[in-house]
Amino acid sequence: MLPVASGTRGSTQDLFQVGLAPPGNAKDILLLYEEDAEEWALYLREIFMRVVEREAILLYPLHSFSSSHLEMLNFYAYKCKLLIISNSLLKDLTPKKCQFLEKILHSTGNVVTLLCGMESSDPFYQLLSIPRKRWEISTEQDPDGYISVIRQILDQGPEDYLEVSIPTDSRAKYPEDTSGQKGTDVLASLRPSVPRVLVLPGEIPCEKPGEIFILLKDELIGEILEVEFISTNKRLRARPARWNKSVWHMKAADFPAGSVTVNIHCDGIIKATTEIKYCSAAKATESPFRVSDPGKSLCQKSIEELDNVLASIFKREIPYYEFKHLQAETYPQKERTHTTELPTLLHCAAKFGLKNLALHLLQCSGATRAARMKATDGSDLLHIAERHGHEELKEVFEDFLSQNTGRNSKQENDYEEDVISFSTYSPSMPSPASLHELRKTHRRNTDRSEEPERSVEMKEEEAGAEARRSLSEGERESSENQYDDLYVFIPGFDTEGNSEEPLPHCRPPLLPPRPGTAASQLERPHFTSQGKVLEDQMERSQNWNDLNARPETREESSREEKKEEAQEEEEEEENPYAFAETEDNEYDLILASKSVKKRTGNRSFIINRPPAPTPRPTHIPPKEETTPYIAQVFQQKAARRQSDGDKFYSLPKKPDKTRMEGPTFPSTRDYLTTGQEELILLQERVKNGKMSVDEALEKFKHWQMGKSGLEMIQQEKLRQLRDNIIGKRPEDENAYDKLTIVHHPSGNTAHNENMLYNSPFNSKFPARIQVEKEFGFCCKKDH
């Protein structure tokens, strides 16, 4: 298959290296699309795989088109060609691409257009010189609609596109063969063996042909439908009257005894072919497949066979048939008036005695309404069945109507409780508009009961469904308007439930944005708290169910609500973090899928919560200036010496020495601080270009020399002050010397003690460092 997201455009070799064309002769569906419709192309391929094989579907991106692909990939051989019309297709529609599309889409019977993000296909047909195609679908249809259209095209037979299936060389050599007898033989040999039309009755008396019914396998979409009768020496065409979408009826033509071919033409194209027989009256009476009295009823064997065939077809093809209002039909007024003699298929079954078909139809949606319909003469199902002598079928209708009229309310209450419990505990809560599908599922599950009880139970279910369908259309439309965006309001799709969707996909892809709605999309909010949406949706659905609940069930529902409230209170006590899901934070989208689990279970959902970031303080206090490490070391040493002195000498330290040690260290620190500030100022001036490097070095040298001179003067003044203070108290000095001599007999110890106290005053400031060596012109921080 063709890779949908190809890396290069217009690269023919890359396309064929991956196997663009499907293998073999399987050429059923050709999908043409642009880049913005790529997801829809993949989505349609998954749908069409229910009808044809995957290898028979070709995805062809138009941004990589080439004229050589027409012959190499044999696009003409595909039975169905589907073009996705999108905004990108109209924007990139060059003359070459227009010519390319005209060659592919020139046929009318097997081309389908899909409107993807477009309101109309008029702009597309204005750019291309091709007739408008009669097959047009939109993204709003359901998958069954797509499959129905594709099946009709694939089942048309080769006659609709024979002109493109014949090779070009053969057509050039034998131009008259394509429209002559040889073409007719090819059509006859290629005509499908499975009949697509059934004409009843199969044998028609020559004297009184009566009326015939034409049952089509698929609905024909066209303006003109004609029936052609062909015998050995006679040909006749007539237009039938429409009974419903797939059934037509007309008066049988007069033909002699023998076989007659019946061709169904739609807009001049043969859609189906079958064969009937004309016979004499005596032979028709003896035949078990023919009506003995055409005006009254069929023979018993023919009725049973027809009943079994129709019932099996309905159960297999349309098991969930739904009766609709007669006013909803879009038939012409003339045909509607003519066909109201038998308004529904149920009335038709009552007339001809089709018991099995009637039992199946009574189980379908809307059977109660259809059973109460009356024909134009005022007769209902009971009168029709009685008039034609079908007493057994009349009893079935009587039981059905009586059970629906006086049915037991307990079953309906049980059903309502099931719906309420489903809406309360289901992880995927459907909208009120989709509860009609829920009723269908409930009814389908009941079909699996035992055969003797099947008809009675399904009649009661139909009665309950009919009573619940009594809501006004306005209320239903208002409920549906609240659920426009299905992808927002259905956060979890229950794929394990009793879903009757025949396809494996969950939802169609999103549509590409329209050019005119870009501004409006920006105005709409794009972010919604999924937890809040789920709670609001469940609350609205619960209110809708409460309106439909009968007074008898309100007491039970109130008790259930009290139990649920008690459970919620327990959950709130056990789960202190449960409120975090409803807040507008970054965990709303993560925890939305687990909101129902939080409600149904008692465990806190905090175990599945990702770790929260460490909270940061709103106000960080400024860091206090700490004492330099070197100063702390000297302070600890001084304190240790002081404690040792108190221990050994038992005399207090001299206060002058403590006071004299203080200015020594801060002076060095202040010197470094002021030196750094001076260096910073000089660096800024050099960067700004106000001063050169040499000038900055010279100025820093002068400043350093000046600072050294000031320090020397200060040290000298401090020394003089100390000498003056010590000289005024000679007796303290003598006592101190005596004490030191007694406790320190060793002269070295006394000498060291004197050196300890005298070192701060005798030490000189360290020599000036080489500024140019370390920083160029900056001072080194560590001495």
Curated annotation (Swiss-Prot):
Extent of the signal sequence: none
Record PTM Phosphotyrosine, positions in chain: Y649
UniProt ANK repeat ranges: 341-370, 377-407
Phylogenetic lineage: Eukaryota, Metazoa, Chordata, Craniata, Vertebrata
UniProt keyword Phosphoprotein present: yes
Subunit field text: Interacts with LYN, ITPR1 and ITPR2.
Species, as recorded: Mus musculus
Protein name in the entry: B-cell scaffold protein with ankyrin repeats
Segments for region (Interaction with ITPR2): 1-154
